[in-house]
Amino acid sequence: MNVKYGLIISSELLKEKEPDGSYTFAGLTQKTFSSISEQSGQEEALSELGKRILHNLDLTENIIDFIPKVNINHYRISSSIFSLASDFSDSLIVKVSDLPNYKDILSKIRSIGFTARQNSVTLSVYPDSTNTLISDDDSIIERTISELNFHNWFFENAGFPSNASNPIIIKPLADPKIDSHKSTVECVQKFYENFQKLDEETQNRLVIQNEESGYWNAVNLFKYFHVYLNEKYDEGMTLSYSNTADDRNSSELEKGVSVEPIVNIGAFHETWKGVVPVFLWSEKTSASSKTPVDYLSNSIPDFNYGIKWECDVKKRDKAIIKFTMPQEEDKVTEEVITTITKNKYKKSRDSSRAFNALYDASSKPQN
């Protein structure tokens, strides 16, 4: 089967069996971090942040270990696993190396990489939506470069090859100033200038996706981010296709003649140079809504290309197994999930309860 389904961030199947929050990612806001620092000292705040990050990494590994059992072999990790340590938009800068459990975190990252490779699960990440390499604001560019390099640092430490098989997917998020070839070239050259400032391994992993509105529909993205950059610098970008973006922001090669999705999919597929592409598939609750449906109305079509489709649906893997295990859906829910939850993930549950209890105690107002 050419169609491979990918899970995005959370597992509803696991949450359903353990609704106490054990399978929910935990973060720490700058305000809460500062509050703990004021009440108990910065070491305590760093310790609390480190515990939450390790919980998130444990949960990530648990999901990666679980999804092959329901025939899902791709996983988009949360871009917020590291909470404040990967947030470069705040004035508070916390480095992972500052955390007291830094060595445990590194060990867990390596374990995640091993588990993914052992289970033939590929990973991707979709950084914060404010990331753009097209801007005249140096602070925006610096923040974007820092965050993209950070996600690359994770993949490097997990032991993955530095190529698009574990992509960091972003959108241009900036249109040409006017609708002309010259202005578009200036826009893309601005991107490329900043792209060159990224770590080499980050460049190898970076993938660009078409947008739901504005200039960067599928054809324009291919024309300039792949063809132009390839002709000009011998470095055309790898492109990720979004079916919703293509539907809402359709493409034309000739005026009045829309390009069919299969054509865009084929063009984008070729930019991956032999790596199985990671694309995005979704259905929304209405024509203008950004909210995905609970369940897909039909299976993802087979476009005669090997593709891993990140499946954007509210019910996550609970929706996906309707297509990956249609004859065994009830069995998966009742037997497989229960066994795995009770045995395999007890450690993650207990860890979550322990550090939440510690935080609840430390955050109570002092008399």
What label would you give each PLM region?
Residues 126:
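Conserved, mostly hydrophobic/aromatic
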